[in-house]
Every structure is written in structure tokens, then in C-alpha cells.
Amino acid sequence: ALAGAIIAGASLTFQILDKVLAELGQVSRKIAIGIDNESGGSWTAMNAYFRSGTTDVILPEFVPNQKALLYSGRKNRGPDTTGAVGALAYYMSNGNTLGVMFSVPFDYNLYSNWWDVKVYSGKRRADQAMYEDLYYSNPYRGDNGWHQKNLGYGLKMKGIMTSAGEAIMEIRISR
């Protein structure tokens, strides 16, 4: 299984994330997440929080510099009208927390794919408050386009999320 693995940062590609999606099987709402750590420091997993949906894998515990983590989420099994929506948190060796939000909704008549990244001061776990902070603070639409921003603390982000119900999200955190 690829999801839950750590790979060389340079090998994080859409093809790898397509394989992570395929591992999830026939699920109508799912996401493959790849986050490349080019920050110069190491990261330790805090937790993943799901507002809706779930995962079948454990968040990779330790992400050294120049390595990338692979993770996935999916809607609940069965005739459930949920998407794969949540946030994850990594404590960084610089003493701050990397928060990442993803939203692959069930109903595309009302919602779109959204994502965002933020660095929080100190140590913080992913929860409903982190999810809401990221979701309601000018997030990026999953529009098949690359986006970038300065995260503060000497870090920047470049990322992309696809618009499909079987979404791919790739993020690179660098100095």
C-alpha cells in the first residue's frame, strides 16, 4: 500500500497519487494527498481530523526533510451522503504546526473541492476549529491549477488540487 508511506520528495508525482486513489477502490468521493517536505526541518504527525468521511491508513508519523508523505481519505462506505472532508496537522521541528485542510464534498450542486495550508504558532492538533479556520479563510478551489503563497516563518507553499470527486492534492512546503 502506498497511502501511509514516506517517499523521496522528488518522486512525488501525479502518477504516484493516482495509484493511491486506485488503492481506495470504487468509492465516489475520495482523495489522495501528497505533501513534500522541503522545509529544511523534520515533521512529526499530530493527527488527522475528519469532519465527514474517514481513512483506512495511519498518518505517516515522521517526515524528514526532502521526503514526502502519502495519505488518503474517502467517504464512508455504503449509501452515505458524505464526502471526504477534514484537516491534518504536523508538528514541525521549528516549533510550529503545519495545518492542511481538504474538502471533497458529496454534493457538487452545492459545493466544490477546496483546500488550504497554514502554519500555526506552537503545537496544535487538527480539529473542527482548525478545519473551520482553514475553510473560511480564503481557501483555494480545487480547480486543477497551481497556487502558491508565503506561509510565514520563512516557509512558502505551492500546491494543486483537482476538481473531481476522485481528487488529487499535491503540496510542496519549502524555504
Curated annotation (Swiss-Prot):
Any one cellular component term from GO for this entry?
other organism cell membrane
Enumerate the residues binding phosphocholine. 52, 85, 103, 105, 131, 135-136
* Localization of this protein: Secreted; Nematocyst; Target cell membrane
Residues the UniProt record annotates as site (Important in the initial contact with the lipid membrane)? 111
UniProtKB keywords: Cytolysis, Ion transport, Membrane, Nematocyst, Secreted, Target cell membrane, Target membrane, Toxin, Transmembrane, Transport
What does the annotation say about its assembly with partners?
Answer: Octamer or nonamer in membranes. Monomer in the soluble state.
- Record protein name field: DELTA-stichotoxin-Hcr4a
Tell me what organism the protein belongs to. Radianthus crispa
